[in-house]
C-alpha cells in the first residue's frame, strides 16, 4: 500500500486540479451574473435585492483565493501563473473586492443609492485590476 500512495497522488493530482479549475470558473460565472444583476438594478435605481447580491459577492471573493493552488495552472484555464509569483497582490485584490461588496451591502441596507453606486464602481474596478494582472 505504501508503494502505491505516491503513485495514487500523482494520478489524482491533475484530476483535483481540474476540479479546482472548474470550481473557480463556476465561481467567476456566478460573480459575473451577480455583478450584471447589480448593475442593472443600479441603472434602474432599484435597491431592493441588492443587499443579498453584494452579500453573495462578498462570500465569493472571500473564498476565491483558495481556488488557485499552485498545481492548478495547467490545462484549460485562463488564470495566469503570475498568481503564484505575486500571491500577496492577488489575495489583496480579492480581499479589497470583498470589502467593497460588504460596503455596498451596507449602503444598500441604508438605501443610500449614491454611496452604493460608488462602492459598486470600486468593486468593478477591482475586477479590471485583477484581470489586467492575473488573467491570460
Regions of interest found by a model, annotated:
Residues 123-135:
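The canonical Cys-X-X-Cys-His
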Residues 1-4:
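Positively charged n-region of N-terminal signal peptides that target proteins for export
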Residues 9-17:
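Hydrophobic h-region of N-terminal signal peptides that target proteins for export
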Residues 11, 121-124:
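Processing junctions and N-termini across compartments
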Residues 6-9, 23-24:
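Short helix-onset patch at the extreme N-terminus, typifying the N->h transition
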Residues 18-120:
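Extracytoplasmic c-type cytochrome modules immediately beyond a signal peptide or single-pass transmembrane anchor
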